[in-house]
Swiss-Prot record:
Family: Belongs to the methyltransferase superfamily. RsmJ family.
Chain sites annotated for binding S-adenosyl-L-methionine: R93, D94, D162
Keyword Transport applies: no
Name of this chain's protein: Ribosomal RNA small subunit methyltransferase J
Taxonomic lineage: Bacteria, Pseudomonadati, Pseudomonadota, Gammaproteobacteria, Thiotrichales
Function: Specifically methylates the guanosine in position 1516 of 16S rRNA.
Organism: Francisella philomiragia subsp. philomiragia (strain ATCC 25017 / CCUG 19701 / FSC 153 / O#319-036)
Amino acid sequence: MNVYDLAVISHIENITDIEFEYILSSQDDKYLYVDNNILKLHYKDKELFIDFNSSEILNRINPSTKKCSVVQAVEGRSKDKLNILDTTAGLGRDTFTLAARGHRLVSLEKDCYIFVLLADTLNRARQIPNLKDIANQIELINIDANEYINTASISFDCIYIDPMFPQRNKSAKVKQGMQVLHDIAFNDDESNSNLLKNIIISKKTKKAVVKRPINADFLYGKKPTSQLKGKTNRFDVYSL
């Protein structure tokens, strides 16, 4: 397949202003393509695309569904609509879930491949009546989180960090999308600790929330103000 296919170039140019030459790769094991007007990433023997209209996401944002842990951790006792910075957009599930609660999101994704997949699903969501208003709550930016923290002039009610957990195995229980995301966009704990450090120093928020494996060390060695614990992970909440 020619990764410089005009359909791919046209599709990317229609959903984002990023330069397509920066994205398209001549690598045989990693390339973008369009299938039924959906932008997809082929990576080795796997396929990745993002769909905010999936049954999983729709169930997650259903008002009758119990608030998930990320919502509880970010909102706390607040009843207000918040301005939130998601420093690690990834597959966008937490961003979209928080936006569905009426919050405004600036969502950062440094990997250009994942970024355009997110831009594509946001563009599709804006064409769906019941998702349009949610998608319009999200500003997606292709940038490294540390760079954004160091240069942005605005502040937020909450800054959220969801570092990918180290993969212990490649079992079938690990979803294919997470396997691909981990392989191409993983940051180690040192990088994530530096991010939390920069957030604290920047004074751009009074609250930071970090998602961690249940038994993992604290990022930046800093004990949180409070925690919300689940079976396999926890949310460390910092009042700054």
